[in-house]
Structure formats: structure tokens, C-alpha cells
């Protein structure tokens, strides 16, 4: 008999699932954060970003690389860019439009609650990447440049000149190394 994976997506309307879930979650006392060790397996874009974010929140992070070098992550192959609903060009972009385009682009096979949550936090992800030093392409006025990509209704793809994946990994690694040096200095 095959086992079914339980994705544990919260109940309720799609637009409110994760908001309601976060509102009813138990919080970790700030004093207890240093007592918790969080194990992150993988140093690709997801693993490195998760480790950097959790480290910035004050958790002890144990990050394991399953390859011979962290820089061998396949995330380095991503070139197109990242979609976010920032509405820079005043073209009516919204979280719902990004959600719809993403679900449609995935042939309606994606978990809608997770895609909606990703659309909600897409602006924060771009802002975090900029704070980590990712050199996104910019317009002459200094605003982040974006383009239409992959059949989207509006221009919402933020990119780093054909090496978006590599630059995102370098940004995440630089955040990790800052945390590493800070914790090493605190241990001395």
C-alpha cells in the first residue's frame, strides 16, 4: 500500500490560509532561540536563504552540504529572473495577478495556497535579495529594472543580467558568511 504525503496546507479560503495560520501559531520566546539548533540540509538557493534568514532571527543554524562544494548547487543555472508583484510600471499588477499567472504557467498543477503565499511575500523576497547585495539590473533613475517574461500579463521579472541564479546564491552565501564570522567572533 502506497503512503500519501500530507502537505499540511491550512484550511480556509486561498487568500487567507497562511495569514490565519501565522496568526494562530505559537511563538518562540526570544530567550529560547539560542537553545534551539535548526538543521538545514542543502546549500542551494532555498537552503542558503533559509539558513541566512533563520540565522538573522537568532537561531543556531547547522547547515549541511550534500555535495563536495556548496557552489555546486543547481540554483546557479537559473537565468531568467524572479517574479514579484511590485507594480513598478503602474500597470495594475497585484498579488492576485501574479498568483493567477503562476498557477496558469504551471498548468494548474501547483498547490494554490502555497503559490498565493509566495505571491504575497514576493516583494519581501526581492527586498531581501537587494539587502543581501544581489546586483539586480537597474534603470537610469536607480529603480530596479523589470521585464515581461514567460507569458506574464505584465512586466514583473527582476533579473541580474543573465546570471540571476548565480548572483542570488552569492548574496545568500555572503549573508551566511557574515553570520558565520559574527558567531565565530562571539565564541572567542
Residues covered by each model-derived region:
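Terminal amphipathic helices with adjacent charged low-complexity linkers/tails
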Residues: 138-161, 165
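Conserved small/polar residues in nucleotide/adenosyl-binding loops
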Residues: 181-186
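Short beta-strand to alpha-helix junction loop
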Residues: 115-120, 158-173
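Glycine-rich FAD pyrophosphate-binding loop
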Residues: 57-76
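N-terminal Rossmann-like FAD-binding beta1-loop-alpha1 element of flavoenzymes
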Residues: 38-63
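Glycine-rich active-site loop/strand segments that organize a redox cofactor
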Residues: 84-117
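Extreme N-terminal leader/targeting segments of oxidoreductases
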Residues: 1-37
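A short alpha-helix-loop-beta-strand transition element characteristic
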Residues: 109-114, 126-142
Amino acid at each position: 500500500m502506497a503512503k500519501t504525503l500530507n502537505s499540511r496546507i491550512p484550511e480556509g479560503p486561498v487568500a487567507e490560509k497562511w495569514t490565519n495560520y501565522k496568526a494562530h501559531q505559537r511563538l518562540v520566546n526570544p530567550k529560547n532561540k539560542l537553545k534551539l539548533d535548526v538543521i538545514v540540509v542543502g546549500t542551494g538557493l532555498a537552503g542558503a536563504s533559509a539558513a541566512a534568514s533563520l540565522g538573522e532571527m537568532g537561531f543556531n543554524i547547522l547547515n549541511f552540504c550534500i555535495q563536495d562544494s556548496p557552489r555546486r548547487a543547481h540554483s546557479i543555472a537559473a537565468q531568467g529572473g524572479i517574479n514579484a508583484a511590485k507594480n513598478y510600471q503602474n500597470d495594475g499588477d497585484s498579488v492576485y495577478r501574479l498568483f493567477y499567472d503562476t498557477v496558469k504557467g504551471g498548468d494548474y498543477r501547483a498547490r494554490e495556497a502555497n503559490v498565493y503565499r509566495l505571491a504575497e511575500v514576493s516583494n519581501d523576497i526581492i527586498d531581501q535579495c537587494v539587502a543581501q547585495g544581489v546586483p539586480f539590473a537597474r534603470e537610469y533613475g536607480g529603480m530596479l529594472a523589470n521585464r515581461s517574461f514567460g507569458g506574464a500579463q505584465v512586466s514583473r521579472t527582476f533579473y541580474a543580467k543573465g546570471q540571476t541564479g548565480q548572483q542570488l546564491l552569492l548574496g545568500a552565501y555572503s549573508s551566511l558568511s557574515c553570520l558565520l564570522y559574527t558567531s565565530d567572533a562571539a565564541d572567542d
